[in-house]
Amino acid sequence: MKTLLLALVVLAFVCLGSADQVGLGKEQIDRGRRQAIGPPFTRCSQCNRNRSPQCFIEDRCTPGDFTCYTVYKPNGNGGEDWVVKGCAKTCPTAGPGERVKCCYSPRCNKN
């Protein structure tokens, strides 16, 4: 029984280590240089209003995508509502009747 438990602990440790190597683990910080180690990434809210009226999904963007964006459309009451939030390499172009707001820091399109 102890051998099985030890094997599971070793397996979990190996799996967590390999997840960090491929970028699936949490961000690692070099304390001496005070900067992130590995491929740079940012986090943006990523959701579609049709699927989720409240946007609570905040996810890690693909490496190289440093722009968070929110697309707005008129709501019929004289105002506008967001319809899509996500990340991209560059700020997307607004379509007819749309407005796009882009920002360039982590979690900046949350509201």
Curated annotation (Swiss-Prot):
UniProt cross-references to PROSITE patterns, sorted A to Z: SNAKE_TOXIN (PS00272)
Summary of the tissues where the protein is detected: Expressed by the venom gland.
Single Gene Ontology MF annotation: ion channel regulator activity
Maturation propeptide residues: 20-34
Coiled coil: none
Superkingdom: Eukaryota
One cellular component term from this protein's GO annotations in UniProt: extracellular region
Keywords recorded for this protein, A-Z: Acetylcholine receptor inhibiting toxin, Disulfide bond, Ion channel impairing toxin, Neurotoxin, Postsynaptic neurotoxin, Pyrrolidone carboxylic acid, Secreted, Signal, Toxin
Entry's localization field: Secreted
Cystines in this chain: C44-C68, C47-C55, C61-C87, C91-C102, C103-C108
One Pfam family here: Toxin_cobra-type
Modification Pyrrolidone carboxylic acid, positions: Q35
InterPro entries xref list: Snake_3FTx (IPR003571), Snake_toxin-like_sf (IPR045860), Snake_toxin_con_site (IPR018354), Toxin_cobra-type (IPR054131)
Transmembrane segments: none
Signal peptide start and end residues: 1-19
Biological role stated in the UniProt entry: Potent postsynaptic neurotoxin. Displays readily reversible competitive antagonism at the nicotinic acetylcholine receptor (nAChR).
Membership in a protein family: Belongs to the three-finger toxin family. Ancestral subfamily. Boigatoxin sub-subfamily.
Name of the molecule in the record: Toxin 3FTx-Tri2
Organism (species): Trimorphodon biscutatus
